[in-house]
Swiss-Prot record:
It is an enzyme of class 1 (oxidoreductase). It comes from Bacteroides fragilis (strain YCH46). This is UDP-N-acetylenolpyruvoylglucosamine reductase. Cell wall formation. PROSITE patterns: FAD_PCMH.
Length: 332
């Protein structure tokens, strides 16, 4: 247990705040022991890699962080494999582990920051793949020390959302996540950017796809170790068919992705760019010059600086397109 613990290394935005108390654990029994000892005082917050958080001030409570590790094969057939992964495993380390063993499914999620537990909370996704389509079950322990295993059908998954993000489940801590991966060669290569990059290689393999995804992300997204950020700051809005057609008539060059016959997803980054924000700064916070969906800490920014920029960007998009874009990042 550490008092007045700096959270600078526990949030990828690089916001310099502290927690009144910081507790780490490496097993379910350790977590249960911390809970039973009474050291987890309210308010409390469980964090992963801090890649989806924006701290707005010092946290006057207890921060919990998992170091539960391990990747265990729990079921296997000729076609697929189920692995149980500790919530504290770094997400990209897990992706690399799978690629090296020729397990298909997570390669498009390469280089996403954060940890495995948070992947199940956030329903991370990229390049046509969402983690909900790979998850089998999520194991948890609550603040009363009770374990519960959620089947994927109980997790309430939707775009960047799950029941674990609900306020009433704040006291539920993810301990393990089980994933089903394919042993048969299978890729999701629907995005034009991926297909264009793959043309540089003589053939498609898991390792090649991972390298391509990493190259694309590194070109568009800043390294949080160099420039603080939380990746995509805003969610891509989903609009109804009628609103989409009206916008398309006005902006025929607008990119879009069909969700179903009634709903269409519009890239928030494109709208932000159209509003002239790409590369623009507001104090020490800025919109990244290569990917307008990303807000960055140019150095010394506080949470309030990032929120002020976020509010200004949202107001511009609302005024120009009549669409509200919402932060993907959680404000603390």
């Amino acid at each position: 247990m550490e008092q007045k613990y700096s959270l600078l290394s526990h949030n990828t935005f690089g916001i310099d705040v502290s927690a009144a108390c910081f507790l780490e654990y490496a097993s379910v029994d350790e977590l249960r022991g911390l809970i039973g000892s009474g050291r987890v005082t309210s308010p409390y917050l469980h964090i992963g890699g801090g890649s989806n958080l924006l701290f707005t001030k010092d946290y006057e409570g207890t921060i919990l962080h998992s170091r539960i590790g391990g990747v265990e094969v729990v079921a296997e057939t000729d076609d697929d494999i189920v692995v149980r992964v500790g919530a504290g495993v770094v997400w990209d380390d897990f992706v690399d582990y799978c690629v090296q063993r020729h397990w298909y499914g997570v390669e498009n999620l390469s280089l996403i920051p954060g940890e495995v537990g948070a992947s199940a909370v956030q329903n991370i996704g990229a390049y046509g793949v969402e983690v909900k389509d790979l998850i089998v079950r999520v194991e948890t322990l609550n603040i009363e020390g009770k374990e519960h295993v959620y089947d994927v059908t109980e997790c309430g998954y939707s775009y960047r959302d799950s029941i674990f993000k609900r306020p009433e489940n704040k006291s539920v801590f993810v301990t393990y996540v089980s994933f089903r991966l394919s042993k048969r060669e299978h890729y999701t290569l629907d995005y034009g950017t991926i297909r264009r990059e793959l043309e540089k290689y003589p053939g498609v393999t898991l390792d090649v796809v991972r390298r391509v995804i990493i190259a694309i992300r590194e070109e568009k997204l800043p390294d949080p170790r160099v420039m603080g950020n939380a990746g995509s700051f805003f969610m891509n809005p989903i609009v109804g068919r009628e609103q989409f057609e009206a916008l398309q008539a006005e902006y025929p060059q607008m990119p879009f992705y069909e969700i179903d016959t009634d709903r269409v997803k519009i890239p928030a980054g494109w709208m932000i760019d159209q509003c002239g924000w790409k590369g623009k700064a507001l104090g020490p916070a800025a919109v990244h010059d290569k990917q307008a969906l990303v807000l960055v800490n140019r150095g010394g920014a506080k949470g309030a600086d990032v929120i002020a920029l976020s509010d200004a960007v949202r107001a511009s998009v609302r005024a120009k397109f009549g669409i509200d874009i919402h932060p993907e990042v959680n404000f603390i």
